[in-house]
Amino acid sequence: MKKMLIGGIRLYQKYISRFTPATCRFYPTCSAYGIEAIETHGALKGSYLAIRRISKCHPFHKGGLDFVPPKKDKNDDSGHTCKAHHHH
């Protein structure tokens, strides 16, 4: 599934995007973001992140730097705030 989605984005980049004016208001571009999101988070969550990014593409959003969030390690509880599990 990941390969199909990324393949679709690459087809867009090769056959459509290169023939349109560069108007992306974000870095990285939405297509590059989509590929990275799918590679990092898998087909389902990556697609969700890509769609969410594309939905920001309108004149009322300032754009700018918008990187794919890192994948959270399921065993990493560094963001966990409950102190009940921590022993000193």
UniProtKB/Swiss-Prot annotation:
Keyword Repressor among UniProt keywords: no
Listed SMART domains: Haemolytic
Subcellular location: Cell membrane
Main location: membrane
Compositionally biased spans, kind Basic and acidic residues: 69-80
InterPro entries, alphabetized: Membr_insert_effic_factor_YidD
The keyword Plastid is annotated on this UniProt entry: no
Coiled coil: none
Membrane topology: Peripheral membrane protein
A Gene Ontology cellular-component term: plasma membrane
Keywords of the record: Cell membrane, Membrane
Region described as Disordered: 65-88
Function of the molecule: Could be involved in insertion of integral membrane proteins into the membrane.
The family this protein is said to belong to: Belongs to the UPF0161 family.
Protein name: Putative membrane protein insertion efficiency factor
